[in-house]
Amino acid sequence: MGSIRLDEISSIIRKQIEQYNNEVRVGNLGTVLQVGDGIARIHGLDEVMAGELVEFGDGTVGIALNLGSDNVGAVLMGDGLMIQEGSSVRATGKIAQIPVSDAYLGRVVNALAQPIDGKGKISASEFRLIESPAPGIISRRSVYEPLQTGLIAIDSMIPIGRGQRELIIGDRQTGKTAVATDTILNQKSQNVICVYVAIGQRASSVAQVVNTFRERGAMAYTIVVAETADSPATLQYLAPYTGATLAEYFMYKKQHTSIIYDDLSKQAQAYRQMSLLLRRPPGREAYPGDVFYLHSRLLERAAKLSSQLGEGSVTALPIVETQAGDVSAYIPTNAISITDGQIFSSADLFNAGIRPAINVGISVSRVGSAAQIKAMKKVAGKLKLELAQFAELEAFAQFASDLDKATQDQLARGQRLRELLKQSQSAPLTVEEQIATIYTGTNGYLDIFEIAQVRKFLLGLRFYLIKNKPQFGEIIRSTGTFTEEAKALLEEAL
């Protein structure tokens, strides 16, 4: 047996001590006390922030919303079927954020901005917080450019400007989504990026909208964020904020964007479900006390940026569903008070065959004519007045049997004006076509036609102007005014 050399052993031990690296990791950990209905109650996580992302043992991610003295209430962003009582939870130290890039255009994503259209990954190097603060007063300027929807009733009487928030409100099945999708289709040549957020809708309805966009070439400038009816409430609640974050990315790059939330009633219901399960005290209609803030912080992110920030814009068109035309319910009144005007779609008009079924009498745009070109202002003023007088007369005429000639003429004119506001779905009109149509109606050129012939005549007129009088459209597009020359060209055509 060889002798043990102490100096050798001591040098080996010294080397081992020098190489020893004890890495200390401090983790904010917790244990699941209870899980179910998309909610987990967690013991521990002493230093977690409100809204922080937490990760469960099975990889499911949640958001810490309720911070109690002895436990934390978190909502799950997934089904969480593998989470059990006693499972470990780790605080990530991050607030919910999503990747953003131009590569999102033409894609369908979920509330976490992950693609769900089967077209592979989306490359992005930049991240933005889902809950970003809205631009301040100094960062904004007043709305002054029109956002053309392609619908005569809206562009002439309820004009929408870039950076505005215009609510679309009405009962189910009255064409609210059709107004929104037509607006997206009309942005094809307007250099506006569109974001369509589907919240709690049937998957078949969302697929139909996406197909329409694909067929009409609108997906090239559109992003669809979809969380369908079978998605967890947490993701339905997050989807609008994800859409707003994607739209803001383009706004700060000096581009114009338009975002449609379809619809915010479903988001409020998802938030109510989460809040009740988290045992937050219910308020009116069982909604939590902060449901107003839920929508106000979302819609305040729509803005027209100042010239120092590049004059980008986000125009928000939120949709809210009413029950039997009751606009005095909680969510509709909240949305009306937050937005800069509302477009009412009426079930009575829809059933009477007037499409789009927009009730022009009670719809309003608080930005108003600031968002119209001069040519439209000139012809549209008369239209609104004549339609208002017609609505009044029509109600009166139901009781009167013998009407004088002037009243009969006014009623006949009103019926023809109402006819010219009718439009097929997915058939938006250019500004010059709208101006020609309105001028024709308000100046009595349609009075000689039967009501059934009005739309046929207008179709012929638009076709004739494009083919034989292209200068008419060029004048309006280039100058934005209804000049004497344009008027003469139109009257020649008539």
UniProtKB/Swiss-Prot annotation:
It comes from the Eukaryota. NCBIfam families: atpA, PRK13343.1. The record marks 363 as: Required for activity. It is a peripheral membrane protein. It is an enzyme of class 7 (translocase). This is ATP synthase subunit alpha, chloroplastic. Its EC number is 7.1.2.2. It is found in: Plastid, Chloroplast thylakoid membrane. Keywords: ATP synthesis, ATP-binding, CF(1), Chloroplast, Hydrogen ion transport, Ion transport, Membrane, Nucleotide-binding, Plastid, Thylakoid, Translocase, Transport. Belongs to the ATPase alpha/beta chains family. F-type ATPases have 2 components, CF(1) - the catalytic core - and CF(0) - the membrane proton channel. CF(1) has five subunits: alpha(3), beta(3), gamma(1), delta(1), epsilon(1). CF(0) has four main subunits: a, b, b' and c. GO terms for cellular component: chloroplast thylakoid membrane; proton-transporting ATP synthase complex. It comes from Pinus thunbergii. One of its GO terms (molecular function) is ADP binding. It catalyses: ATP + H2O + 4 H(+)(in) = ADP + phosphate + 5 H(+)(out). Produces ATP from ADP in the presence of a proton gradient across the membrane. The alpha chain is a regulatory subunit. ATP binds at residues 170-177.
